[in-house]
């Protein structure tokens, strides 16, 4: 459950380290984002030589949440941190590597490049 002002870790090697959610995309009254949703973020911490700089506004897809997500079969999945992968204008990941597991809901949201780069899909 990601909402405005939520801080997220970055799960790729784009150069950003921490994001802050500004807006959840998908409707004017939409408050929360979950696995596979696109959010607009501000970069709060970044590496000095990375592709993404501090203060930049970027779009990202949520790949891990602390809040549990209920699957269709009734099972629950949750992670130790909130994390996202930064996207470019064509909804492809900016980084070339993905760190840590990603939820299966990312595949259902048609982010196949992220799923193929991820070391584990839970």
From Swiss-Prot:
One Pfam family linked to the record: Ribosomal_L14
List the keywords (alphabetical): Ribonucleoprotein, Ribosomal protein, RNA-binding, rRNA-binding
Query: In its UniProt record, which GO terms are filed under biological process?
Result: translation
Keyword set includes Ribonucleoprotein: yes
Q: Which cysteines are joined by disulfide bonds?
A: none
Q: Does the keyword Ribonucleoprotein belong to this entry?
A: yes
Give this protein's Gene Ontology molecular function annotations.
large ribosomal subunit rRNA binding; structural constituent of ribosome
| A Gene Ontology cellular-component term | cytosolic large ribosomal subunit
- Which InterPro entries does the UniProt entry name for this protein? Ribosomal_uL14, Ribosomal_uL14_bac-type, Ribosomal_uL14_CS, Ribosomal_uL14_sf
Annotated coiled-coil positions are none
- Name the protein family: Belongs to the universal ribosomal protein uL14 family.
Q: How does it assemble?
A: Part of the 50S ribosomal subunit. Forms a cluster with proteins L3 and L19. In the 70S ribosome, L14 and L19 interact and together make contacts with the 16S rRNA in bridges B5 and B8.
Biological role stated in the UniProt entry:
Binds to 23S rRNA. Forms part of two intersubunit bridges in the 70S ribosome.
Q: What is this protein called?
A: Large ribosomal subunit protein uL14
Q: Give the classification, highest ranks.
A: Bacteria, Pseudomonadati, Campylobacterota, Epsilonproteobacteria, Campylobacterales
